[in-house]
Structure formats: C-alpha cells, structure tokens
Amino acid sequence: MDPCECAKTGTCNCGGSCSCTNCSCTSCKKSCCSCCPAGCSKCASGCVCKGKTCDTSCCQ
C-alpha cells in the first residue's frame, strides 16, 4: 500500500520514507516522488514536479 495520499488528494508532503508509485500528484517533494531524481539540483528546494528527468522540464 502506498503510504502517500497522492492518488487521493493530489498532494504529497511526506518524508524520505515515503515512496509514491504514481507521480500524478501536484506537490511532490524530491524525497517523496521519483519524478524529482536524487541529486537533481533543480528539484532540491521542494518544487512541484512536472517531469521525470533532471532537466529544465523537471520542475515548474
């Protein structure tokens, strides 16, 4: 069972132990969803994910 509420609420504010299985949530944190890859400086400040790779489309 996914400990995140992403699928239900569209938000995800959990810690490093959380693992979202679908990155359709609109407020994923880097530690929570794989759409913000580890080591991605563009995603390091808790920005909203909109992509799955560490490039200009990674976050908005």
UniProtKB/Swiss-Prot annotation:
Binding, a divalent metal cation 1: C4, C6, C20, C23
Pfam families, A to Z: Metallothio (PF00131)
Binding of a divalent metal cation 6, residues: C36, C40, C43, C59
Region described as Alpha: 29-60
Entry keyword set: Metal-binding, Metal-thiolate cluster
Free-text comment on this protein's domains from its UniProt entry: Class I metallothioneins contain 2 metal-binding domains: four divalent ions are chelated within cluster A of the alpha domain and are coordinated via cysteinyl thiolate bridges to 11 cysteine ligands. Cluster B, the corresponding region within the beta domain, can ligate three divalent ions to 9 cysteines.
Protein family membership: Belongs to the metallothionein superfamily. Type 1 family.
Protein name: Metallothionein
Organism of provenance: Lithognathus mormyrus
Gene for this chain: mt
